[in-house]
Amino acid sequence: MDNNTEKFNELAAIADESELNEMLDENITGAGSTIQCVNTTIGTILSVVFDCCPTSACTPPCRF
């Protein structure tokens, strides 16, 4: 199991999608956002490598 899969499984075990959305909504500030994620075949994974939201579109549809 790769590191991204492990991170996703840890998140999935502790929070459902609505809780993750609430957490991200509270932390995203548009262009200054530090929340990063990557879409994979198993879902969206928070990451320190990829920025999933363009600076003008940090919205739930962008994140997920």
Curated annotation (Swiss-Prot):
Residues 1-31 form a propeptide. One of its GO terms (cellular component) is extracellular region. Its main location: secreted. There is a cross-link at T44-C52, T55-C58, T59-C62 (Beta-methyllanthionine (Thr-Cys)). The modification 2,3-didehydrobutyrine is found at T34, T41. There is a cross-link at S33-C37, S47-C53 (Lanthionine (Ser-Cys)). It comes from the Bacteria. Contains LL-lanthionine, DL-lanthionine, and DL-beta-methyllanthionine, when coepressed in E.coli with the flavecin synthetase FlvM2. Keywords: Secreted, Thioether bond. It is found in: Secreted. Lanthionine-containing peptide that does probably not show antibacterial activity, since its analog [+2]Flvbeta.d does not show antibacterial activity against M.luteus. Also does not show antibiotic activity when tested with [Del2]Flvalpha.a, an analog of Flvalpha.a, which is encoded by the same operon than Flvbeta.d. The bactericidal activity of lantibiotics is based on depolarization of energized bacterial cytoplasmic membranes, initiated by the formation of aqueous transmembrane pores. This is Lantipeptide Flvbeta.d. It comes from Ruminococcus flavefaciens. The lineage of its organism: Bacteria, Bacillati, Bacillota, Clostridia, Eubacteriales.
